[in-house]
Structures are given as C-alpha cells and as structure tokens.
C-alpha cells in the first residue's frame, strides 16, 4: 500500500501517483500537491500559517482562539 502524503505547504492529502517531490540541497524532501503550493513556498517564500486558504492557517487560527 502506498504511503499517504501531505502537502508541505497547504496540508492537503496527496493521492498516490500525483503531486511533486522536491529535494533541497541539504537533503530535505518537500512534497507539494500543486504548482500553486510549490510556487508559494519556494519562489515566493510565503509562510503557510499566514496564507488564508491553507489547512495550516486554519489550525494556527484555531490554536490562537483556544479551540484546540
């Protein structure tokens, strides 16, 4: 059974056989579900907690409100 992976930017589940794996020079592996996520993290350098449409932002805001 293939591993279920999550996008390192938005937190969505990546279906097996889809998505993109990016390996940094230090050996860190990043998984992206779409080019939108890849661009936002690598090219634009955005923090997932500050981008409103990501799961990581929703989790961060819930934590700030004390819902978790």
Curated annotation (Swiss-Prot):
Residue positions binding Zn(2+): 7, 10, 33, 37
Cofactor note: Binds 1 zinc ion per subunit.
Co-factor(s): Zn(2+)
SUPFAM superfamilies assigned: Glucocorticoid receptor-like (DNA-binding domain) (SSF57716)
UniProt keyword annotation of ATP-binding present: no
Cross-referenced CDD domains: Ribosomal_L24e_L24 (cd00472)
GO terms for biological process, alphabetical: translation
Alphabetical list of Gene3D superfamilies matching this protein: Ribosomal protein L24e
Superkingdom as given in the UniProt entry: Archaea
Keywords: Metal-binding, Ribonucleoprotein, Ribosomal protein, RNA-binding, rRNA-binding, Zinc, Zinc-finger
Residue ranges covered by zinc fingers (C4-type): 7-37
PROSITE patterns: RIBOSOMAL_L24E
One GO MF term: rRNA binding
GO cellular component term of the entry, any: ribonucleoprotein complex
Pfam families xrefs: Ribosomal_L24e (PF01246)
Function: Binds to the 23S rRNA.
Family of the protein in this entry: Belongs to the eukaryotic ribosomal protein eL24 family.
Complexes and interactors: Part of the 50S ribosomal subunit. Forms a cluster with proteins L3 and L14.
Annotated protein name in UniProt: Large ribosomal subunit protein eL24
Protein's organism: Methanopyrus kandleri (strain AV19 / DSM 6324 / JCM 9639 / NBRC 100938)
